[in-house]
Amino acid sequence: MPASGTFGSGQEYSEFVDLNQLGAVVTKGVSLTPWEGNPAPRIMETSSGMINAVGLQNPGIDVFIERDIPFLQKFDTKIIVNVCGNSVSDYLQVVERLSETVVDMLEINISCPNVEHGGIAFGQEPKMVEYITSEIKKITPKPISMKLTPNVTDITEIAKAVEADSISLINTITGMRIDVQKRKFCVANKTGGLSGS
């Protein structure tokens, strides 16, 4: 199964990969409302992989339910939806909507910045991780996986705070690439997520 954010919503790769051969399709992040993402350039190769600063661009939950779920239902594979948000309310509303659909599992991306609490990622505070997990479990019967951020001092403390069905390790590591000749950042957002190539 592909990692979230690497495979779109499945449609983008269905001409190249037989989705029936995958144990599951993990979608890119889906938010309550459409997100435009970050300005370009968003992706840059590095000597050790790739920096991406896409910014969770997506059309929002309404379009996802109307367009992407019916497409994915055509295949004999599980559907895991990555959920993103900027507030606890955002997460809960998306989870509530997805609970009424045929998706098999929800992956909660707690690497998102919490705009209600100064922009720190939800997944960097154990009490917030515990709170958001318990609130989500109250409103959905679907299994949930909490996608943890590596950008913490002690990930074991965060993992112990998660009372989900599973955890997803890990989101990308914060990194940057600088063009030393031009003395400029290579991605418009300055930093992005460092992953393998």
Labelled PLM ranges:
Residues 1-79, 84-86:
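N-terminal capping/small domains of soluble enzymes
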Residues 15, 86-197:
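Alpha/beta enzyme core
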